[in-house]
Amino acid sequence: MPSELRSPRLAVLIDADNASAKIVDGLFEEIAKIGEASVRRIYGDFSNPRSKGWADTLSKHAIIPQQQFAYTTGKNASDITLVIDAMDLLHSGRFDGFCLVSSDSDFTRLAARIREQGIDVFGFGEQKTPESFRQACRRFVYTENLLAGAANSQDAASTSKPLQPSSAATPIIMKVITQMESEDGWVPLGEVGKQLANLASDFDPRTFGFRKLSDLVRRTNSFEIDHPKGGSMRIRTKSAAGSPPKSKTVTKTAT
């Protein structure tokens, strides 16, 4: 019998000093959409009261703590240990992807190095995370979007305040549509979603208060929407819809 397709095997490495324990339920729900969290480790000084929140969640999610005492002020042994473990796991050849949970730009080079090896990196951090780390990941998820109540409606905006207004998504969606170079301006929404992920690793409809890209597009009121019979939803910019066809310039010959 043919073997069943296996979910991507993931290594989840959490920086306890730069991630809140409040995200843990949403974090593993999000990771489950990507693959199987085969390794779950968290790094920090759990003798510190700041890490107590994480200590209370470890058993529920089968997270293995990697205790690192802060012997010297200003030296982060936890970060170093996380990087060493990540490289050991990378060279084991057993993983299809890594989930790095931190808002610390110090992990930018680690993410880039893992991707150089042809392995996907999924980052999870707060909106304040430096762009260098966000863009080093194949995909970056803002942890504010993982909290209970964040964009929890299936079809409309959440009652909680979004991280950014829906209008802020318009320029990047327009940019993608332009890059796709459709003759009549119409592009499939599914393809737009794929290109958005390639262009901006941290693009997420939930950041703007919506679970689905289609709902976000409708709310911006900047796009024409079409549902072809038997086809998928497609969109184009309203400016493209109202633009007259280009006319040829006729040069008069002097007589």
Report each predicted region and the residues it spans:
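Domain-level signal for Mg2+-assisted phosphodiester chemistry and nucleotide/NA-binding surfaces
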Residues: 1-91, 120
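Short, glycine/polar-rich helix-capping loops at beta-to-alpha or helix-loop-helix junctions
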Residues: 50-55, 125-134
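Conserved phosphate-handling catalytic cores of large alpha/beta enzymes
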Residues: 134, 138-151
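Acidic beta-strand-to-loop metal/phosphate-binding motif
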Residues: 13, 43, 96-103, 110, ...
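P-loop/Walker A NTP-binding module and the surrounding RecA-like catalytic core of P-loop NTPases
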Residues: 21, 40, 108-112, 117-122, ...
